[in-house]
Regions:
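Positively charged n-region of N-terminal signal peptides that target proteins for export
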Residues: 1-5
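Compact, glycine-rich, soluble single-domain proteins
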Residues: 24-152
Length: 152
């Protein structure tokens, strides 16, 4: 009985861990949220650390939780209106540098959610890097998390 409990607890810890290392790329502090239970879109945020001697570039993202998953950012137009746009050129992660995907800035956008985001739900996501290749990460939904904007 104790062994079964330990295995279950350890498996849960691994699944809920917000830290993933894939070679020289380290993902930490990953979480996702949406505007509410009826939202058709959601977003994910995280820290990406590049421990290699050369810059890499996050060039894409994929998840089965939504019809479409993209890298997005917010831009202000000439009239001062802020709008969300897809990042086509990818996101550079400098050598030995950390880059944050944050609310109000660069982030992962899930459009056409296939199911509601509920706190505690695990979302499997694949990040695609030019050099590091595919990096799988399990992102935990945290609807209650509310952080201030970070600058890049």
């Amino acid at each position: 009985m104790k062994i079964k409990f330990f295995i279950t607890a350890f498996s849960s810890f691994l699944a809920l861990s917000s830290f993933l290392s894939a070679g020289q790329i380290v993902i930490s502090d990953a979480y996702a949220r949406s505007a509410g239970p009826l939202a058709k879109a959601g977003a994910a945020y995280m820290k990406i650390m590049n421990h290699s001697d050369e810059s890499d570039r996050l060039i894409g993202v994929q998840s089965d939780i939504a019809k479409k998953t993209e890298l997005h950012t917010h831009l202000k137009d000439d009239n001062g209106v802020i709008r969300m746009v897809r990042i086509d050129e990818g996101i550079e992660i400098g050598s030995m540098k950390e880059h944050r995907l944050v609310r109000g800035g660069q982030h992962i956008m899930f459009m056409g959610l296939k199911e509601a985001f509920k706190t505690g739900k695990i979302i499997p996501v694949t990040l695609f890097f030019e050099i590091a290749g595919e990096v799988g990460v399990e992102i935990v939904v945290d609807q209650d998390r509310n952080e201030k904007k970070h600058s890049h």
